[in-house]
Amino acid sequence: MSQSDWSSDVCSSDLVSMKLTFLGANHEVTGSCTLLEAAGQRYLIDCGMEQGKDVYENQPFPVAPGEIDGVLVTHAHIDHTGQLPLLVRNGFRGRIYATKPTTQLCSIMLRDSAHIQEFEAEWKNRKAKRAGAEPVEPMYTVQDAEAAMQLFRGMEYNTKIELAPGLVIRFIDVGHLLGSSSIEIWVTESGTTTKLVFSGDIGNQHQPIIKDPTTIRDADYVFMESTYGDRSHGPRPDYVGELSRILQRTFDRGGNVVIPSFAVGRTQELLYFIREIKKEGLVTGHGNFPVYIDSPLAIEATRIFKDTDPDCFDEDTRALLAQGIDPIQFPGLQVSVTSDESRMINADRVPKVIISASGMCEAGRIRHHLKHNLWRPECTILFVGYQAVGTLGRTLIDGAVNVKLFGETIDVQAEICQLTGLSGHADREGLLAWVNAFSPKPKRVFVIHGEDEVENIFAQTLTEQGFTACAPYNGEQWAIGAEGAVCLQEGSRVRLEHKPSEGASRAATVFQRLVSAGKRLLRVIEHNEGGANKDLAKFADQIKDRKSVV
């Protein structure tokens, strides 16, 4: 089954007490958010911001933020956490649960995101004032981000936490980012326990610094990412060798290597590789070449990495630390904190490495470095991470001959390349290895967090391997229990580029709601076939009286 449909598992009246609503990152890779209603509680799993091209509209919360009891965070990336300050701004006052490293990283990442919101609003308002237009408000402010951080509770890995009677969770290291986790959730209702597992972003094998993903043995229902569910990374590349060759040929041309990098995780991996390159003398003829970290967020994140409990790191990193070696520090490493320091980086022609954020080139200082280096054929722009559809990074990788930066059209003459295989996400084989660790197979796997066709392809792959799998759309709602699952409400499959006019959209939406309600009612009726006559008679009376039955 490549996408969700109206077929269901076994369903009975007790199922409607636990519901899941898919709100974001379904048939797209950003804006992760799912609402769990169970054991008398309402919890969000992640609350992320959409980045890049918006393919399917994220759905509004079906309940007010003030009615949500808490949020469970899989990891600190903004596409999983970026809406938390907005949630708080709109009335959320519950607790936010995450691992301790995730909590520390969120403290800098949410504040940084808020600064970006404020800066963009200020920039738009300057333009609006000149045009006589109405001012705009930032999505949220630094104050909102700080208020959100007050609600965080840092948790240990592998420790069960009771959130409420009948609702227990546990964080398991999933090897995607420092502090990243899968989340196990046990829901007990009417004396029956159902186990859910949210994969979070599943890490790639053999990443530097952090551990490999931990697998989980049992679950009734699994909700798993599928970012690279249609492809293989291939044999593990020689990252150090490939990076050293890129540096060598670029420096020999007299150019800079500009690396758009995620400030958290990928930047620290690059420092790990460059330390090895310098230690082994793999780049020759350029002395102690300078390496700049030009991202205040990356600088703060690097500090958090250095202060983290070594138990969070892999065996190689722990061995270096035990010898008193800092695995992400080396001669020639320079940090740029202020804007003046950032501007000075491009003031000379000394070949250098510039690592700057954001990783998809959508914001931040990287855009200034692209402006100064994209037009220079001696330079290299090196991408080291996933580039979402619609981002400037994806545009460059796809072969753009020119791009617009700060109102100017810039010719793309620099070498554009990728450090292949360097990914924080598992490929198809890694995803299959993770899900095949469940024994017995889960009752159903919900495939999420993947580009449109990738989700369908990976759901079909799982089906061919004997899993019951589907790929829900934003707005889709399922009732789930120990006996089975049933789709209560179909998600929206209208792509934004094909979105009808507002009036037509409203009419279509209302009619679709009516059709969905009818299908939902028929499904519940069919699954009560064979029930006790007394219960069926009561059910019929409820329908006759037009009372809510679902």
Predicted regions and their residues:
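His/Asp/Glu-rich metal-coordinating catalytic cores
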Residues: 16-72, 77, 81, 86-269, ...
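Hard-cation-handling environments
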Residues: 246-391, 404, 439, 454-456, ...
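Single conserved hydrophobic/aromatic residue that forms the stacking wall/gate
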Residues: 1-14, 549
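Short, surface-exposed amphipathic charged segments that create phosphate/polyanion-binding patches used
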Residues: 167-171, 304-312, 432-433, 482-492
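Conserved acidic residues
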Residues: 9, 69, 220, 352, ...
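Generic long, charged, amphipathic alpha-helical segments
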Residues: 404-435
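A polyampholytic, Gly/Pro-enriched intrinsically disordered region
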Residues: 117-122, 309-323, 486-512
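Short, compositionally biased "basic patch" segments
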Residues: 208-223, 310-317, 387-413
